[in-house]
Amino acid sequence: MSNPSNDLTREELAAWLRLEMAPGVGNRTARQLLLAFGLPQNVFDASAHTLEQVVTPRQRSGLQSIPPQLPELLETTWRWLQSAPLRHRVLTLGDPAYPPSLLEMEDPPLLLYVRGPEWAWTQPA
């Protein structure tokens, strides 16, 4: 099921949240994984051997486990998105609307939770 204000499906949102929550995997490592595999779901579909070409065994283990808090966080985030479809949005690193200045950081956040009309956060301050 897709969210009208966001191009993310619920399944895609779950994968992004899971990557963000993976134990031992910070923003820098997550970005390396995204460069290597493309989308978060591809990271989770990768074999242990393939993952260990990019991350440590400890990080691989964290990526292969599903955080117990994920279902609740997914439900809360999805409800938030649905509550104001034209005013709430989750921007991922791969979203064309992700602020370019943040992409220049060494470890930009994987997800940005945006509230308000799009013009308010896309215009320079």
Describe these PLM feature segments.
Residues 1-125:
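Short, positively charged patches
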